[in-house]
Amino acid sequence: MEAHESDVGFVSRRTILAGSAVLLAGGGVGSGITALAAAPETPVSAPPLPWQWVKLDPVEAGRRGYRFYKEKGGCGSASYLSLLSLLKEQVGHPWTTMPDMLMVHAAAGFGGHGTLCGALAGASVIINMVTYGEKRDEYLQNNAIVDRLFWWYAEQDFPTERFDDLSPLPKQIKVKAMSPLCHTSVSKWSLAAGVTDLHDQAKIERCAKVAGEVAYTVT
């Protein structure tokens, strides 16, 4: 296909010469070198998976998860960002290439549909990135870790008291989730706690503690 000067991204000899003339008119070759030096750096590409994992402080991960639930848009961001932020601090690249708000859409079971709990989804993203492999045994190991996390969640009495020192509502009623699904987990607890409003402070505290507990458990 023939390229034309009007095409986006096409640079002709005439365009280069015209640009050079402008640089020269503006102060000589030195000005051109300065302009080139100020050009944005080429983004560093991320390596293929799996990425490096290090042992993280589970308490710090959990406390960030609790806090990020309230500050960063719900359960999906809470678990994902609690782990990611620690990996950015302790490992650096390539984790620093990951966007902080990647999992905000997972709140309330993905767009409010009450499907998979966002805390599980956010944590699973990180798990996949450190355990992914193309060989069958690696694939099975990856799946097994996520599977165990989901089963643990379903059998857990939520919320725990682990983060009660951060909460204005300690010692909340505990109810077994029975499912990794947001709707089931939240509905069973809400019925037992007498909560009818999804924006009730008690429900917010419960889910913040759940997000913290997921982050704590993954580490």
Q: Where are the regions that the model predicts?
A:
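N-terminal twin-arginine translocation
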Residues: G9-T15, A25-S45
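Active-site-proximal helix-loop elements at catalytic-domain edges
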Residues: V59-H93
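Amphipathic alpha-helical interface segments
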Residues: Y80-L87, I127, Q141-T219
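Acidic-glycine-rich active-site phosphate/pyrophosphate-binding loop
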Residues: W51-L56, L86-H105, K188-W189
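Phosphate-handling active-site elements
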Residues: Q90-P99, I127-I145
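A short glycine/serine-rich beta->alpha loop
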Residues: R64-G73, A106-T115, L198-I204
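Conserved phosphate/anionic-ligand binding catalytic regions in large, soluble enzymes, centered on
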Residues: H113-V125
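N-terminal secretory signal peptides
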Residues: M1-V11
